[in-house]
Regions:
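Histidine/acidic-residue-rich, glycine-tolerant segments that coordinate divalent metal ions
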Residues: 1-116, 198-199
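Metal-dependent amide/peptide-bond hydrolase catalytic core
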Residues: 78-257
């Protein structure tokens, strides 16, 4: 939340990586759609960077029965949302890395029969490549005010960085792969594709080599489960034991190198 620094960034600021100095870092995330006993990982870019954007649209208030007397910020907002998606579908080379622009909140309006003066949109940008992120940011900054102007309104956009790309150090992954296979069994250690979720563990990885993997939490005998951040999310706690063992053995093997 705004005004709070929680998580990895604050821990780093307070010196968690110093005294003693940290040489490497390991982390895991439970996954409700991976079977208990299975570990999934990816070398290199694993989880997306996250940015938060706010778009403010200014129109001119008028009665809903006389739209020609005003400038409709809700209509402009709809056009902006539509335009933003073309950045992803028509301008971003998705065969290289995935990218997402999502408007998650729209606030506007005073009454059902009034065209309001303003609208606000808040959303997120997810990328796995910083050059791609820079391009998407630039196009959003160009497109938002231009679309508003085309409909006789005004719009501003601010983009704030959230988390960095969760990047698994390839050498560290190679070093730790035998450890994971020994603990979980080679057949239970599986590669996966990058995902567009974000993780502040990435801030640690900007400072020291890191390895972040996913631990199975789907109950044995289950073929489907609900994803994270849904009302029916559920994991099997028995899967946590493998996570403890894996992190312990990783630490011991790394220190013994």
């Amino acid at each position: 939340p705004e005004g709070e620094e929680g998580g990895a960034a604050l821990m780093i600021k307070e010196g968690v990586l110093e005294n003693p100095k940290v040489d490497a870092i390991f982390g895991l995330h439970i996954n409700s759609q991976t079977p208990v006993g299975v570990i999934r990982y990816k070398s290199g870019g694993t989880m997306a960077s996250s940015q938060r954007f706010v778009i403010n649209v200014i129109g001119k208030q008028t009665h809903g029965s006389q739209p020609w007397g005003g400038v409709d910020p809700i209509l402009i907002s709809a056009k902006i949302i539509d335009g933003l998606q073309t950045i992803i579908s028509r301008e971003t080379k998705l065969i290289d890395e995935p990218a997402v622009i999502t408007v998650g909140k729209i606030t506007s309006g005073v009454r059902f029969n009034i065209i309001p003066e303003s609208a606000e949109m808040i959303g997120t940008i997810r990328t796995l490549d910083y050059d791609m992120q820079k391009f998407i940011n630039q196009r959003m900054m160009e497109m938002v005010p231009a679309i508003a102007k085309a409909f006789r309104g005004e719009a501003t956009i601010t983009i704030n960085n959230g988390t960095a790309i969760t990047y698994n150090d390839p050498d560290l992954v190679t070093q730790m792969l035998p450890t994971m296979e020994r603990v979980a069994g080679a057949a239970n250690v599986q590669t996966q594709k990058a995902i567009t979720g974000a993780e502040d563990f990435s801030f640690f990885q900007e400072k020291v080599p890191g390895f972040y993997f996913f631990l199975g939490g789907m109950a044995p005998g289950t073929t489907e489960s609900y994803p994270h951040h849904t009302p029916d999310f559920l994991i099997d706690d028995s899967g946590l034991l493998l996570g403890v063992k894996t992190l312990t053995e990783m630490s011991l093997d790394y220190l013994a190198k």
